[in-house]
Amino acid sequence: MSATPPNKKITCNVCGADFYPSDKWQIKKEKLLLAEGTDAHRFLIYACGTYQKSDVQVIDFGGINELRPFLKNLVEIMENFSKVKTLVIARDAETNVKSAIDSVVSALKNVNLPVPQEPFQFSSNNHIKTALMFFPGPDQEGKCRNGTLEELCLTTVDDAPLLKCVDALLQCAQKNNEDLKHPWKSRLYAYLAGKDDHAGKKLGQAAKDKVWKLNHAAMAPFKKIIQEM
C-alpha cells in the first residue's frame, strides 16, 4: 500500500512550487530525524548507529527549498504521523545561518509544530517535541555559525597530517587562478583522495567506513540531541 495518495499534489504557499508526495517510504518509528540530502542522510544514519539509537528513523527531505512542502506532506497526509513523538531537522547553515534558521522555523510554523527557541534545544507541546540542528554546529560561544556538513566532517579529523598536504594543494590551485566555489567540498574530497581505499567516495559512504570520528568533540551537540530524541 502506498504511504500517500499517488495523485495528491501540494502547492507551497511561499514559492508556488508543486510538490508530489513520495510513496516510497512510510513512517515506521516514533522518532524522525529529517536530513538535507543524501550525504547528510547517510551520515546521520551512521551517527545514530554509533550512538546506539536504533529507534530513530532518518529520512532525506531533499534540498533546502523542499523542506516546507515535505513537512506539509508529512504532517497532513502521511499515515502514522500522529504516532510521532520526536521530530528533529538537520541541514547546512550555508553562508547565512540566520536565514537558515528562519527558513526552518517558518516551515515548522506553517504546519503548527512547536518551534525551539534556539538550535540544539528541544521544544514540545502535548503531542510532539522538535529540535533543529545546523551543520557545522555551534562555535565556542555556543552560537550556530555558517558552514556545511563537509566542514564538520573535516573538523572531526583535524589532527590528521594529511590535511596540511590538502591545504597546500588547494592553495596552489588558487594561486593558479582556480576559483574554488565550494572550498569545503574541495577540501573534503581532496582529503578522501589522499586516503587509502577512500578516493572517490561520497561523504556518507566515508562515514559508513569510519573515516570521520563521530565521537569527536565537534559532534557533541549533535550526539546530545540524537541521544535525547
Task: Spell out what each predicted region is.
Residues 1-5:
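Helix-enriched interaction subdomains in cytosolic or periplasmic regions
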Residues 6-95:
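Acidic, glycine-rich catalytic loops of TOPRIM or P-loop NTPase phosphate-binding modules used
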Residues 33, 141-142, 177, 207, ...:
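Generic alpha-helical structural element
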Residues 39-40, 94-96, 138-141, 197-198, ...:
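Conserved nucleotide-binding/hydrolysis micro-motifs of P-loop NTPases
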Residues 48-51, 78, 108-115, 157, ...:
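Hydrophobic, Leu/Ile/Phe/Ala-enriched alpha-helical segments that form helix-helix packing faces
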Residues 78-87, 181-186, 200-202:
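A general structural signal for short secondary-structure boundary/capping elements
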Residues 99-193:
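Activity-critical C-terminal alpha-helical subdomain
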Residues 187-229:
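Charged phosphate-binding loop/patch that engages nucleotide di/tri-phosphates or the phosphate backbone
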